[in-house]
């Protein structure tokens, strides 16, 4: 498989369990990066979200962490081939054990297949299932690593997101419901959370496709700085 090419960078992914997908790209394009100087990407995989953060922001330091050593090595390689190599690095470490200065922005496309049969490929299991990182552990780690006034953005299926929001010590400030087609069921939810805010959350929605099975104008608009086809 050749590299997945974006407008300003490419992602090599042959040896990585979880390839570049719609969830990660959509989150990376949607999250608010304004004012973020230090960014953490939990479960960085290929490093695609961290690379998108580097393209979109003026952050001085962007760190991707992953428990898969092969993914971490690949992310560092992808970072080194990018225009922003001095601002990016990947660490092979469970977030529960990760120690660092606080981050202004934390992003994650976390594992969520909690009830399905485990993949026979152990590395895909790590990437796709919550066997090594539960949502409560994720929340504890984010709260520990998030700076005052910082934000946490993630994408999950609806049921898991509602469960996460209900148990989180953080509060939603932005939310976007993601549909495959207009009028269909919600397939994913993106949320941005912060500490102790009393503000009313900004609510959005996006359909990836039109009824004619073409990419929607709103999806094209949000991802146009990245996908070659837009």
PLM region descriptions:
Residues 12, 16, 20, 133-186:
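Conserved Class I SAM-dependent methyltransferase catalytic core
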Residues 26-108, 114-120:
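Conserved SAM/SAH cofactor-binding pocket of Class I
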Residues 27, 109, 138, 193:
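Residue-level signal for inorganic ion chemistry
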Residues 110-137:
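Mobile active-site "lid"/loop adjacent to the S-adenosyl-L-methionine
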Residues 184-230:
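SAM/dcSAM-binding transferase cores
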